């Protein structure tokens, strides 16, 4: 969810990412295309590409935290890195509609609507994932209507944030858990001084599988960098 020093979105505003042609179909699409079964070979290969792309982005931000001024630019760079992988390239047929689409998508609807506080009532509106990867086998089964409204359960999802702290990180974590994503990733980047760093890093320490997290924090005043790579059990000062 985009939420950095210059931008903020709540759940209602996220709905603006929904294309106009999807809104008229919401009440007509009642089923979703499920994610491929665990162990799917295509997904396993895609995971390798995704994790390598995230690691490259982390390395870039660790070395040069001001290459990108805002989070939108980081999203664009991540999409670029993902698209460099042959496994994730190309256009694939959407069932027998005669139309094709790509596998990497921005602002893909959440698999399951979240519950709103304080009533804990399920909100019919859905927020969006920052980046989602669909499998070709899913597109083969999806109707054009299911694709248009985003009713395809993405097996790989990435939430990327710049310059926010514990509350939003916890929200992104819960978003991924609520949608029961097969391969969920959090990318948490910061270059701001904050009294919330300790709380944020406690949340990071408590991230549980299947969610994986990559983290970089630049303490510009003290010229220190804290990093946690995907698969690493701890944050390492550099």
Model-derived features: positions:
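A domain-level signal for the structural core that forms small-molecule/cofactor-binding pockets
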Residues: 116-117, 152, 156, 170-173, ...
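Active-site metal-binding core of divalent-cation-utilizing nuclease and nuclease-like domains
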Residues: 92-151
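Catalytic core segments in nucleotide and nucleic-acid processing enzymes
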Residues: 133-141, 151-162, 173-178
């Amino acid at each position: 969810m985009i939420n950095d020093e210059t931008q903020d979105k709540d759940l209602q505003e996220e709905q603006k990412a929904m294309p106009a042609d999807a809104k008229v179909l919401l009440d007509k699409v009642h089923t979703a295309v499920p994610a491929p079964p665990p162990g799917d070979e295509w997904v396993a290969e895609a995971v390798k590409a995704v994790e390598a792309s995230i690691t490259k982005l982390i390395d870039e931000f660790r070395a040069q935290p001001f290459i990108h001024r805002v989070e939108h630019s980081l999203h664009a760079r991540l999409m670029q890195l993902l698209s460099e992988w042959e496994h994730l390239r190309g256009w694939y047929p959407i069932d027998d509609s005669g139309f094709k689409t790509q596998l990497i998508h921005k602002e893909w609807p959440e698999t399951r609507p979240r519950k709103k506080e304080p009533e804990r009532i399920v909100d019919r509106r859905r927020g969006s994932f920052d980046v989602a990867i669909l499998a070709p086998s899913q597109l083969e089964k999806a109707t054009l209507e299911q694709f248009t409204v985003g009713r395809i359960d993405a097996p790989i999802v990435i939430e990327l944030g710049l310059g926010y702290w514990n509350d939003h990180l916890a929200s992104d974590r819960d978003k991924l858990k609520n949608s029961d994503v097969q391969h969920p990733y959090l990318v948490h980047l910061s270059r701001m001084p904050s009294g919330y760093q300790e709380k944020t890093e406690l949340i990071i320490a408590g991230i549980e599988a299947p969610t994986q997290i990559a983290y970089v924090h630049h303490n510009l005043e003290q010229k220190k960098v804290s990093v946690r790579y995907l698969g690493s059990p701890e944050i390492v000062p550099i």
